[in-house]
Regions:
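Mid-chain, well-packed structural core segment of small domains
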Residues: 57-85, 172-197
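Active-site nucleophilic cysteine motif
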Residues: 118-135
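Conserved beta-strand-loop surface patch within small alpha/beta domains used
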Residues: 1-63, 72-107
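Surface-exposed patches in mature extracellular/periplasmic domains of secreted proteins
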Residues: 139-144
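...with weaker cross-activation on analogous glycine-rich loops/strands in unrelated enzymes
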Residues: 145-212, 218
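Second-shell loop/turn segments in exported
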Residues: 112-118
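Glycine- and charge-enriched low-complexity intrinsically disordered segments
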Residues: 215-237
Length: 237
């Protein structure tokens, strides 16, 4: 997950300090060199864009990862996350205001607790699949739609897919590996968030734009839970 070295982080901070009013960007090349390239975005104070020639030259040298900076936003932006979800390269963003780095490496396993949110790579469903993989249960990839689409009233992918992987737990005797289907948004009637039990009263989940964590399955979460499923492989015969 954290793929930058201390020296590489320091170099990125130095590049960022030279341009405090706009986003800077660049690559980490094979061998560890950190380079800055021109941000050709028409709105460099809020976005970054790398020109094709710079990308080509870096590709010839061998790209290990992509980095850029944010002036105020602490973390990957929605646009960053959409692009990252379709990319195989590690990404990093440095926030000048907070002084924090956020890193995402889709090629490396991430810890279940404390992973950063990155839609399509580190999100609520990928956390569920990773936890269940530890239990020997392989789940298919569910469609997520576009970033933020889970807040729309007609968002149904999770509900459409859920009963294909397990059956409802009706007696509230929950166990490790049971999947929670929840609605946390403004539009009831559909699932917009999922989690997974780690024991009969605590569950693991990854809220949008926050780090993954474990919460107690108290009254508030019970009200937000639409259904609990037990994967087929975990039902005792």
């Amino acid at each position: 997950m954290n793929w930058l070295t201390t020296t590489q982080r320091q170099q990125i901070q130095e590049y960022a300090a030279k341009k405090p009013t706009e986003e800077t960007c660049g690559f980490v090349l094979q061998g560890g060199a950190v380079i800055e390239v021109e941000n050709v975005s028409k709105t460099p104070e809020t976005h970054f864009e790398i020109g094709p020639s710079d990308y080509l030259h870096a590709d010839i040298a061998g790209i290990e990862g992509v980095w850029h900076t944010h002036l105020e936003l602490d973390g990957f932006s929605p646009l960053d996350q959409q692009v990252l979800a379709g990319d195989s390269l590690p990404w990093a963003v440095y926030c000048l205001k907070s002084g924090k780095f956020h890193q995402c490496n889709p090629n490396a396993p991430a810890p279940l607790l404390g992973r950063p949110f990155c839609f399509g790579v580190y999100d609520c469903y990928s956390l569920v699949t990773d936890k269940l993989a530890e239990l020997g249960v392989q789940l298919p990839q569910w469609p997520r739609g576009l970033y933020g689409e889970w807040n729309q009233p007609l968002f149904k992918p999770f509900d459409d897919e859920a009963l294909n992987v397990g059956s409802p737990v009706l007696d509230e005797l929950y166990q490790e590996g049971d999947i929670l289907l929840m609605n946390l948004g403004d539009h009831p009637g559909h699932t917009d968030h999922v989690g997974v039990f780690v024991d009969h009263q605590r569950f693991l989940h990854h809220p949008a734009e926050k780090e993954s964590r474990v919460d107690r399955f108290g009254s508030w979460w019970k009200r937000k839970t639409r259904l609990v499923l037990r994967p087929t492989a975990l039902w005792k015969s």
